[in-house]
Amino acid sequence: MNSKAIKPSCEYFLLPGYIFMSPEPYLISTVVGSSVAVALWDADSKLGGMLSFLYPFRESSAESTAIYGNVAITYMVRMFREEGAKKKNLRSQIFGGAESDCCEADQIAHENVKTARSVLKKHGIKVISEDVGGRLGRKIVYNTFQNEALIYKVNTLRNSDWYPYDGQGRQA
C-alpha cells in the first residue's frame, strides 16, 4: 500500500444528468446502464470530477442540459479550465453504454459511448481507460485524488442503486 496515498474523506453520489468536481479528494459513486459516466482528472493539480449523461447529444442550444453527452462533457471541460487546468494535463475515463433487450436502448448506448469518445477527442483530451458496452450495468466508485475507479458489474439495477439516500442525508 502506498503510504503517501490520501484517502478521500468525502463522498458524493452522482445522479444522471449531473456534473461534480472538487479540488478536495472525493469518492464519487454513480450507477450506469445504457447511460455513460465520464471521469476527468488534471494530472498536475489532482483536480477530479465526474459526469453522468443519459442521451448522446442535443443539437439545439435550447433545453441543453447535462443529460446530453455533448453538453455535459463540454461544460465539464470548461469548468476544469476555469479552475486553471490545461487541456494537455487532462485525462479521462469512460464507463457504461451497456446493451439491453431493447433495440432503441442499444442504439442510445452505442451513441452515448461514441459521443463521449468524439467530444473528448474534439477537446484534445486523452482517454486513458474505458469500461463500456457489454450487457451488464455498472456501479462505479471514482477516487478524484488518485484518478482510480472501482467498477462493479451487475445484472440488474435496483431503484436503491440509483437513489441510495432518503432525501434527508440518510442512506435508504
UniProtKB/Swiss-Prot annotation:
InterPro entries: CheD-like_sf, Chemorcpt_Glu_NH3ase_CheD, Cytotoxic_necrot_fac-like_cat
Superkingdom: Bacteria
Top EC group: hydrolase
Keyword annotations from UniProtKB, A to Z: Chemotaxis, Hydrolase
GO biological process: chemotaxis
Documented EC number(s): 3.5.1.44
Catalyses which reaction(s): L-glutaminyl-[protein] + H2O = L-glutamyl-[protein] + NH4(+)
Keyword Secreted annotated: no
Function description: Probably deamidates glutamine residues to glutamate on methyl-accepting chemotaxis receptors (MCPs), playing an important role in chemotaxis.
Protein family according to the UniProt entry: Belongs to the CheD family.
PANTHER family linked to this entry: CHEMORECEPTOR GLUTAMINE DEAMIDASE CHED 1-RELATED, CHEMORECEPTOR GLUTAMINE DEAMIDASE CHED-RELATED
Name listed for the protein in its UniProt record: Probable chemoreceptor glutamine deamidase CheD 2
Source organism of the structure: Syntrophus aciditrophicus (strain SB)
Gene: cheD2
